[in-house]
Amino acid sequence: MATCIWLRSCGARRLGWTFPGCRLRPRAGGLVPASGPAPGPAQLRCYAGGLAGLSAALLRTDSFVGGRWLPAAATFPVQDPASGAALGMVADCGVREARAAVRAAYEAFCCWREVSAKERSSLLRKWYNLMIQNKDDLARIITAESGKPLKEAHGEILYSAFFLEWFSEEARRVYGDIIYTPAKDRRALVLKQPIGVAAVITPWNFPSAMITRKVGAALAAGCTVVVKPAEDTPFSALALAELASQAGIPSGVYNVIPCSRKNAKEVGEAICTDPLVSKISFTGSTTTGKILLHHAANSVKRVSMELGGLAPFIVFDSANVDQAVAGAMASKFRNTGQTCVCSNQFLVQRGIHDAFVKAFAEAMKKNLRVGNGFEEGTTQGPLINEKAVEKVEKQVNDAVSKGATVVTGGKRHQLGKNFFEPTLLCNVTQDMLCTHEETFGPLAPVIKFDTEEEAIAIANAADVGLAGYFYSQDPAQIWRVAEQLEVGMVGVNEGLISSVECPFGGVKQSGLGREGSKYGIDEYLELKYVCYGGL
């Protein structure tokens, strides 16, 4: 049986439901049918055979605002970073489109906040199920627009979907409190309520997972969102919008406004300064994060930020070399070194240094294969663009000019302008760029140290503190170092630490707040104290 929610006071759209498990029915003339023809780019569907047979419905190029697919006045090209070929032209949203998206989200919030936690949970679960059903197509979209090896893209889609599953469950666990006061005729209650419209700005390196980690929590809490995806990877965000629509997520709850690099600054400013936006969630560089914090300050908006890192990877003399090398490979070369928690500097104690460097170099030569992300066996795809390659190249040249030794790699790869050889440097010192500037590429610089105190001092010298790793077999040392490292996340004898169940975030200039875990939903909730008197 269908049930309708109609709140005239908030000017929201009519939302049609069936309980339980029915899709939203948009009003006539509203939402473009999810199953209808999609204006997906032919180039993307045919790219290198890797996207042959991909569902056209998932290849969207327009913005998604208020439950409708809308073009913009202009478009911008999205390129395959492996070949440089154009994948398609995407709507280039500007300030007008950004404000319209915020308005749509605000109007939808009036109704969405009143939807029961059980129903929000059900809708998120449907979205999760659709991601799993379409996981192969979604993975191929990621590989096409980011260059990520297809095996890793599949892993990201599962990771991404698991956030929707997790927060579908957390939606039903938003509890308040009862506080007993000294006054016998009073009771004090603490309510948790959704904060409002959230502006969500996401990066290109995890174009799906960074959306669901934020949006899953926001929607579970009862918030609505406006997503501005990275200009390099908008197709993943738009594909998620299509699946959200198919899942029955109401019109205006999830909005996507892609834009070009030229418009990114003004669009970001527009959504972050709009008075109808109550929350900003951003993943990206520390530099950009500071700009957005300035925008938020004028209207005192709630902010969550996951910014840059300079993750140390410490190997103590007591470590198992083989385990440390395996952890280093996983931590450094996932997504070709383009993750915010990638190890950026390897601190290796003198007694184990030579054995570690030798084993690390051998593992790199044996296990890393540079190639197109769609090619079977590829472990290292292209960097996102030539600017990223230039940064790695600059760091390598700087280190070598100051005395570092190239153990393996060290130059651009013959495959193309966006490829760089996996590189290992030794004899690295702290005056080199690669030790105090986030690389975001396949470069592993090794610094030799003598004492535990020295390693901790080097690791904590950074003004950022997202993740840190260390390998040791000494239980007392493990506790000391884990507590002393100034980071938000620590991997002890482990190189891969991200999990939907665990809090993700940093300290210092690596950001504010936590994502994922049971704490992630709190970023989108406000506490309200209610004093009930006269009892």
Curated annotation (Swiss-Prot):
Q: By what name is this protein known?
A: Succinate-semialdehyde dehydrogenase, mitochondrial
Look up the transit peptide and give its residue range.
1-47
Query: Where does it reside?
Result: Mitochondrion
Q: Which residues cross the membrane?
A: none
- Broad enzyme group: oxidoreductase
Q: Which annotated residues bind NAD(+)?
A: 213, 228-231, 284-289
**Entry-annotated residues carrying N6-acetyllysine:** 126, 265, 365, 411
Keywords on this record?
A: Acetylation, Disulfide bond, Mitochondrion, NAD, Oxidoreductase, Phosphoprotein, Transit peptide
Keyword field contains NADP: no
Principal localization reads mitochondrion
- Sites where the protein binds substrate: 213, 334, 498
Cysteines joined through disulfide linkages: 340-342
What does the record give as the reaction this protein catalyses?
Answer: succinate semialdehyde + NAD(+) + H2O = succinate + NADH + 2 H(+)
The role this protein plays is: Catalyzes one step in the degradation of the inhibitory neurotransmitter gamma-aminobutyric acid (GABA).
In the record, N6-succinyllysine modifications are located at 126, 135, 184, 265, 402
Q: Does the keyword tRNA processing apply?
A: no
| Enzyme Commission numbers on file | 1.2.1.24
Which GO cellular component terms, listed alphabetically, does the Swiss-Prot or TrEMBL entry include? mitochondrion
